[in-house]
Amino acid sequence: MHDMTKDIEYLTADYDNEKSSIQSVIDAIEGQDFLDVDTTMDDAVSDVSSLDEDGAISLTSSVVGPQGSKLMGYYQNELYDYASQLDSKMKEIIDTPFIEDIDKAFKGITNVKLENILIKNGGGHGRDTYGASGKIAKGDAKKSDSDVYSIDEILKSDQEFVKVIDQHYKEMKKEDKKLSKSDFEKMMTQGASCDYMTVAEAEELEEQKKKEEAIEIAALAGMVVLSCINPVAGAVAIGAYSAYSAANAATGKNIVTGRKLSKEERIMEGLSLIPLPGMGFLKGAGKSLMKLGFKGGEKFAVKTGLQKTMQQAVSRISPKMGMMKNSVLNQSRNFAQNTHVGQMLSNMRGQATHTVQQSRNWIGQQAQNVKRIVNNGLDKEIAHPFKQQLAPAGMGGIKFAETTTLRNMGQNIKRAVTPQNHVTHGPKDSMVRSEGKHSISSHEMNSSKYVESPNYTKVEFGEHYARLRPKKLKANIEYTTPTGHIYRTDHKGRIKEVYVDNLSLKDGDRNSHAQRTVGGEDRLPDDDGGHLIARMFGGSKDIDNLVAQSKFINRPFKEKGHWYNLEKEWQEFLNSGKEVKNIKMEVKYSGNSQRPTIFKVEYEINGERNIRRILNK
């Protein structure tokens, strides 16, 4: 049987943009730089002192970490408080009125007992006694009136109806083996037009099932619509078959599933799809009946002249039958006019837009305040953290201008303490080409093996995500997957390095959503969600192993597909009994982008060291 359903759709782009704005401000004042700056300065002092054999240099620094961290924490708390208030406000002006009015709208068309429906004889002739001119009786009709009949009375007085019920029972019995004849007959004569569960009732029920995050309203067509040649048979059948599924005929089926509104599904569009009576809601119900009741063809026909097919039956509807159907529709339209659901939903768009605009203005002001304080106030606090003294021969002085900031401070320190006699790579090493590949000498073979570093905080697998939406990795951490793969993140929570001691073939799962969304706003149209360690090697399915990767390197494109080819090469070596060991991946980014620019992969195959540099394009 076909259920006529309507869904309420939510367009969440505006709200998602709002969340992105909040997150961008939080990112702008991320406190990790403040928390680490004291350690960085201490390390610099230590490095300089280790090279200053004659003790000619004296360096002192000011502690800035606690102050910067405090400021960062203040703004994060303020932003989270704001986000919480925004959520509550939107629930107040959108969710609550919407739910309340939906409940009111359905209250008038649900739980209508078939046993209380009276059919008033319109003066038909012969076997058409309750036929085309009959209509649902008004409120002043009484069961005792000579020209008024209940459905139960009509069914018992006409064996043709009894035969139809028997035939339908046999069909429904095929779907529900436990359906008894008595339950079916009771449902046919005493059932309700449809059953409705309010959102409040549904939420209480779902509390036992760990509430879901979205709401889905599926309305079953349940009004009594006379869509058959015989109006009484139509009334009974449509009331029964549209309100109850074949597998649950005796107990009924709820209109609302009751899933809880998601916090992210606030800005509601597409509200015209709500199934109000008289607006396409009833028409579908008749089609549902026709599809079920006459799918068996001629054996389901009744004496009133139904032909073999649904199309022929519809063409036989008489003018009187149409008048009676219109009478029912008018009653439904009156109901629709008496409810303010439509007006409420129309106004809702304006309220939601106003709320979003207010929040955008607030975010804009806060972003400017944050920018001003970070660029001005903090610079003054940390200017001249070092007092420059004498520098030994062979080292550059540590110079800090009046406008020294956290951003360039680390670069100055790094330049000052880096020895000038460092080893440079040869031409082959320095070439950054997507197809770059070479072997290196034995004295470099251990350079890519995993070495512990104090610059990363080790966390348990499962604790490596920040409590943010959308999901994001924590900054400056090291985590190990259940398969033994080690990952490190940078100060932005981006995967920076990956280490695998001994690669092996293991089947992994796939997370399609993560693969479609990783990289966020920096993702390009031609990007895939690329696994750093492939699923066939036991790589994680989540964003802790995924990056935005050009499909031209991630797939087997002719003359390209460099990442794909590397994975296939490893697979072939493992299948042939060779070892792929000591893998180190370095993932390079540009600025604050979440999309990598270059992948550098080092690995050993049977003791021979290899390096690949692959451009992400």
UniProtKB/Swiss-Prot annotation:
The keyword Secreted applies. InterPro entries: Bact_secretion_toxin (IPR051768), DNA/RNA_non-sp_Endonuclease_sf (IPR044929), Endonuclea_NS_2 (IPR044927), PT-TG_dom (IPR027797). Induction: Expression is activated by mutations in esaB and essB (newman). Pfam families: Endonuclea_NS_2 (PF13930), PT-TG (PF14449). Residues 420-448 are annotated as: Disordered. It comes from the Bacteria. Component of the type VII secretion system (Ess). Plays a role in Ess secretion during infection. Required for the efficient secretion of EsxA. Required for abscess formation and staphylococcal persistence in host tissue. Possesses a toxic DNase activity that is modulated by EssG by forming a nuclease toxin-antitoxin pair. This nuclease toxin targets competitor bacteria. Belongs to the EssD family. This is Type VII secretion systems protein EssD. It comes from Staphylococcus aureus (strain Newman). The gene is essD.
